[in-house]
Amino acid sequence: MSYVWETDNLVKEFTLSGGLFKPKHTVHAVQGVSLYQSPGETLGIVGESGCGKSTFGYTLMGLHQATSGSIYMNGRQIDPYVDRKAVHPVMQMVFQNPYASLNPRLTVNAILEEPLELDPKYTPRDRVIRVKEVLDQVGLNMSFGERDAHELSGGQRQSIGIARALIMQPQCIICDEPISALDVSIQVQIMTLLERLQEQHGISYLFISHDLNMVRYISHRMVVMYLGAVMEEGPALDLYEFPQHPYTRALTALNGPVIPHAPIGAPLKGDPPNPLDPPKGCLFSGRCPEAEGRCFVERPPLRDWADRRIACWHI
C-alpha cells in the first residue's frame, strides 16, 4: 500500500544557548518516531503537554527542520522544510488558536484566495469559484467572504481555518488541537464538520490532542507519545479499551474504567522528566509503578504485539 506520508526514525532537537561562557543545551523534542498514514484514515496522536506531538506535526509539515531521519510523501523521500512546494498539495494544517492563525484585518476571501494566487493554474475567476466551493463545504455562505476575520466568532474562524486547509485539495490535514480553544458546543460542530468532510472527500487527518476521549472518538488508529517517543500505537478503540503500556493505562485511568476487568493503571503522579536530560532507560521509568532494573538502564524498542506496537520491557 502507498501511504500518504511516512516517517522513519524522525528526530527533532532544539539547541538552547546556555549564555555567555556556558554550554549549550539540547531539547530532545521528537525521538526516533516511525509512523505512517493510509489514505482516508484518521491517525490520532495523544499525550501530555510537552510530549512532542505538535512538534512532530510541525516537522512533518515543514515548519520545523528535522534533525535526522526520513520523511516520505506518496512514497517519495522529501525534506518538507526545504521543498515546501512538494508538501502543500499533499498536506495542510489547521492550527489550535483560530484567533491567532488568521490575519484579523484581511477579508475571508483574501485569506482563502492567497494560496491559490501562488498556483498559476488558477485564474482570477477560478479563484472566486474555488473560494465559493470551500465556503459551501464548511457550511458558510458567500456573504462571509466579504467579512474581516476579526468580525467572526471562534467557531466561524476555525471553520475558515479548515476551509483554508481545504482550498488546495490536500490528501491530508494536520489538525493541531483544533477544538481546544473553543466552547464545548462549538467543539461538537467542528468535529461533526471534520467527519463529514472526510466522508465526502476521503481526506486523511493527523489529529493531535491531549484529550484521549476525543482522539479515541475520531481516530481509526491512535498513537500515545511520551517525552518525544511513541509508547504505544494501534487501533483506536481497542487501544483505548484495552491499554497495555503502563503510560497508556495511566492516561485511561483519568477517564475511569471503560470495560469491566480491562487493564486500567494508577493515575499519573509527578511531572515528566526534563527533555533537556531524558532518562537513559525507558523514558517512562521514573513515573512507572512497574519499573525495575532493566527499565532504568536500557530503552525498550517499539515492538509488534498483536495488532499494535508497544515500547515496554514488561510486554
Residue ranges and their predicted role:
Residues 3, 17-21, 235-315:
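Short catalytic/signature loops enriched in Gly
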Residues 61:
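Helix-to-loop junction immediately C-terminal to a conserved catalytic motif
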Residues 148-152, 156:
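Conserved ABC ATPase signature
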Residues 125-143, 252-253:
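Conserved ABC ATPase "signature" region
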Residues 167-171:
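A short, proline-enriched helix->beta-strand linker immediately N-terminal to the Walker B motif
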Residues 182, 186-263:
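P-loop NTP-binding/switch modules centered on Walker-like glycine-rich loops
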Residues 20-24, 78-92, 118, 238-243, ...:
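ABC ATPase NBD coupling module
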